[in-house]
Amino acid sequence: LYSSAASDVYKRQVNGTTVTNLKFEHLTALYQFKFTNRRPDAYKVTKVVVSADAAIFPKTLTVSGEEKTYGDKSNSLTLSMTSLEMAKNEVAYGYLSFFPMADMTKDTELTFTATIEKVGDSSSTETIEKKGKISELYNAESVVAGDEYKYVAGKRYGISFMLVADLGYEETEAGKYLVKKEDGLINLASEPTVMTNVATVITLDADLDMSTKEAWVPVTEFKGALDGNGKTISGLTIEATGNDAGLFITNNGIIKNLTLKDVTVKQVSGAAGAFAAINTGTIQNCVIDGGALTVNGADAKLGAITGHNQTGASMIKDCKVKGNVVLTVAGGKVNAGGLAGVNGWWSKAQIQGSSIDKEVSFVYRGNGEGAIGGLVGWNVQGTITGCYSLMTITAFTAVNAGGLVGGNEGPVTASFAAGEIVAKASGNIGGLVKNGGTLTGCYSTSVLSGTASVTICGISTGSVTANECYFMSDGVSNPGGNLPTSTKVSDAAALIDKIASMNQAIAGSGYKYVENTGTDSARVPLLIQPDE
């Protein structure tokens, strides 16, 4: 005598016409399928298929006394459904009975395939899948684990499916995001609670090509950690939010290990930098490789990395600007540099181990004499250590420029400039800085030229304190800044002879000079590197 229900089949033992001994025995087990919809639209489940490589699912069961005979085996079971619908964040269940057999062991490979579609859109059919060995599909606390990963009649086994929208990223744990596609970064940037959470960690899992995407709208503030993981974001176009523009308007977190390639920052009237308009956090081991950044506004600030490295907590370290990067001041009185427009604000903001390559160029057409530098436009009591600039600056209007720093009010240590400044209007040009501050263990081989109305000095055009600083420049004999003429060296060999004294002056800075043995050694006789 057999009885069946939707979820179970069992048998009763009967002697003759009188029930003398009634015994229940489960003959089936039950799969419970749990579906959770995390997508914004309502979905329904139309089918679930359980399959295996071998034919392990019997379609028939014959019972004679204590003997069970399974027949007509198949390698799959199907549960068809018509009304299992879920709105956003809803949970639904489906059930499928099956005959458990000894063939189903912990090493049996199973595949669970659910067919789903968006409610009201039959053309949106898709499948989601879970697969693995029985021992891999269940955790150690599960029923099947307690039965040595064998299915047992009369028990229920749960398999869960999560319907997750393809947002382009994966939340690996609370607050930790792995970006896999361009839309992943875009979608995360649109979540203020993610951007302003100090516990947020965003890691790139792939290079991102943003060239076909709409212009990036800068995130107002970022407080978490963005780890580029050595990946590259290419083709990014950034539009100003208000007066400012950057990947972030204010970075109060950490940006590291990220390259922006062929980045465009459209005309800005305030602060502009590819990574951050204003940096109050850390930007480390980041690269700009090709691109164009333009500002036009009174008191604007422009740098390839950041417009303003602002506070005592601000740090730019081991960053590089290379490739065909063009920085342009189209108008206004602007503080601009290859790396940062302004460093510090009467505070000890820091820049360390960073550089500007020779392919980078600067075009100045501002109104009024802004401060322009190969590395930093205006250093306002910030510190600069172990840096260099090889960029070319061309000024078509009046300008105050330095090969490394324009206006300087802070210490510059173990750094050099070996680029070019061409001034086509009035102004002041210094091979290292336009004026001011303290220079220690620095040198300039900058090529300096200008009209008759331009003051040109080998190191600084204004008052400056310098220790073990030298310049090498054809046609320029005046070091400037009330510095002794002995600060000029005749050639690369003479500068190389200064290594010992320069390294003694910068001892403790974390950097040291070494002789350059490369093909560009005539222009760059000494290289700066970490003193490890």
What are these regions (language model features)?
Residues Y10-Q13, V164:
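Short, low-complexity export/processing leader segments characterized by acidic and small residues
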Residues K23-T36, I316, I351:
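A short, Gly/Thr-enriched small/hydrophobic beta-strand-prone motif that recurs across taxa
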Residues V14-L22:
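Surface-exposed ligand/attachment interfaces on beta-rich extracellular proteins
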